[in-house]
Amino acid sequence: MKVRPSVKPICEKCKVIRRKGKIRIICENPKHKQRQG
């Protein structure tokens, strides 16, 4: 899980999800998991 000021999808399988006002990216590749800090 990477915490970054700006999150962007890295590949086609990355999905952008809003949870409790935070933007997250989930993907099949665990390295692509991100969350906005």
UniProtKB/Swiss-Prot annotation:
HAMAP family from the UniProt entry: Ribosomal_bL36
A single GO BP: translation
The keyword Endoplasmic reticulum is annotated on this UniProt entry: no
GO MF term (any one): structural constituent of ribosome
Gene Ontology CC: cytoplasm; ribonucleoprotein complex; ribosome
PROSITE patterns xref list: RIBOSOMAL_L36
Listed SUPFAM superfamilies: Ribosomal protein L36 (SSF57840)
Domain of life: Bacteria
Organism: Caldicellulosiruptor saccharolyticus (strain ATCC 43494 / DSM 8903 / Tp8T 6331)
Protein's recorded name: Large ribosomal subunit protein bL36
Signal peptide limits: none
Similarity section: Belongs to the bacterial ribosomal protein bL36 family.
KW RNA-binding (keyword) present: no
Keywords: Ribonucleoprotein, Ribosomal protein
